[in-house]
Curated annotation (Swiss-Prot):
The lineage of its organism: Eukaryota, Fungi, Dikarya, Ascomycota, Saccharomycotina. The keyword Nucleus does not apply. Heterodimer of an alpha and a beta subunit. Its EC number is 2.5.1.60. This is Geranylgeranyl transferase type-2 subunit alpha. The gene is BET4. PFTA repeats lie at residues 45-79, 92-126, 131-165, 177-211, 242-276. InterPro entries: Prenyl_trans_a (IPR002088). Pfam families: PPTA. GO terms for molecular function: Rab geranylgeranyltransferase activity; small GTPase binding. Catalyzes the transfer of a geranyl-geranyl moiety from geranyl-geranyl pyrophosphate to proteins having the C-terminal -XCC or -XCXC, where both cysteines may become modified. Acts on YPT1 and SEC4.
Length: 371
């Protein structure tokens, strides 16, 4: 039994039939591969060659050499740089986008499919026929199917960047695009606190949005209202307000999934990024209060975990060490306090894979904290 699915034990006859069937598939695959390699060696860029690459890439989308050959076919047989009509090339590129989309739905984590789609779009850019808004809709739907897909999030940032380039002289529109992305990360995180890519995207968006607002305010000598009522903009009037908002948001994640590193990594970023720490320069005690509040919260979660599981939570202990180290640094005192030592000793017991690291930290032979 694996993931709730009962394994079916094949009879000897069924095994033999399966083996015969697999051998036929392997033979056909090798034959098709040899045919395509021969076509490429002969610099054959025909429609028939393109169809052959279709057949092989449907079977094996990881075969990046075939994607390379496919691009050679498109350029040599259809590209307007080879005296072909722009409309013909545009049509074939859009057909290929459709082919790629079908493959992405079946293999959403295959890098080479995403890579080929980017290439197709840049070819359309050369023709002045790319539709980034449509592409934005495509990647949004793909992320709805798999909201934690790293490739999908990376591709979404790529699309957003190109949408920004199209409106580079309209900073208000650029701001709206990024605020919409910020709100999108909020929705995705609320659905799944383990969505590392959404948290990561948030760390990129927050400084960017804040800087956009600051630039506009400096240029026009006005407050944030110059942007109208853009959803979410009110949070960015003050970094401390934004920090408190996000600390409140991740509190749920800490309580629900203390074993999930995504939430902890985002917490570390919130507590150490210059955007937030610089805002506390004239209010140092407020920063210390926040650190102590977070330490108390994590200690409470750890106590609840001990009641439920009978032992400390690794994520909680590591975070308690991290925040204690921040507090000691702010006070210009040694990091290796008795509480930190106690946490390290517990970690050495419950996290044996990293036991030697914790022991080195206890002995002062490895740093406790990097900042």
């Amino acid at each position: 039994m694996q993931h709730g699915i009962k394994r079916v034990k094949l009879s000897e006859e069924a095994k033999r039939l399966k083996l015969e069937k697999d051998q036929i598939k392997i033979k056909n695959y090798r034959q098709l591969t040899d045919e395509i390699f021969e076509l490429r060696a002969n610099e054959n860029y025909s429609d028939e060659a393109l169809i052959k690459t279709n057949e092989l890439l449907i079977i094996n989308p990881e075969f990046y050499t075939i994607w390379n050959y496919r691009r050679e076919i498109l350029i040599n047989n259809y590209s307007s740089s080879n005296d072909k009509d722009d409309q013909i090339y545009e049509d074939i590129l859009n057909q290929d986008l459709n082919f790629v989309l079908v493959q992405l739905k079946k293999f959403p984590k295959c890098y080479w499919i995403w890579n080929h789609r980017r290439w197709l779009l840049f070819e359309l850019v050369k023709l002045g026929k790319v539709n980034w808004k449509y592409e934005f809709g495509v990647v949004s739907k793909l992320l709805d199917l798999d909201q934690r897909n790293f490739h999908g999030w990376h591709y979404r940032r790529f699309v957003v960047k190109n949408m920004e380039l199209e409106c580079k002289n309209d900073t208000t529109l650029i701001l709206k695009i990024n605020l919409d992305e910020f709100n999108y990360t909020t929705l995705k995180i609320q659905k799944d606190f383990s969505n590392f890519s959404a948290w990561h995207n948030r760390t990129k968006l927050i400084p960017k949005i804040y800087n956009l607002i600051q630039q506009q305010q400096q240029q026009q000598q006005k407050d944030g209202k110059i942007f109208g009522d853009l959803p979410g903009i009110e949070l960015f009037q003050n970094p401390i307000l934004l920090l408190k908002n996000d600390l409140e948001m991740i509190k749920t994640g800490v309580y629900m999934s203390p074993e999930d590193t995504s939430v902890w990594l985002y917490l570390y970023w919130l507590l150490t990024d210059d955007l937030f720490t610089n805002a506390f320069k004239s209010h140092q005690q407020d920063y210390m209060n926040i650190l102590h509040e977070q330490l108390q919260l994590i200690n409470e979660v750890n106590e609840m975990e001990k009641e439920d599981t009978g032992q400390d939570n690794v994520g909680c202990l590591k975070s308690m060490i991290f925040i204690n180290a921040l507090i000691q640094n702010e006070n210009n005192k040694p990091v290796l306090t008795e509480q930190v030592k106690s946490c390290l000793k517990q970690l050495a017991k419950i996290d044996p894979l990293r036991k030697n690291k914790y022991l080195d930290q206890l002995a002062g032979n490895a740093p406790i904290f990097h900042h």
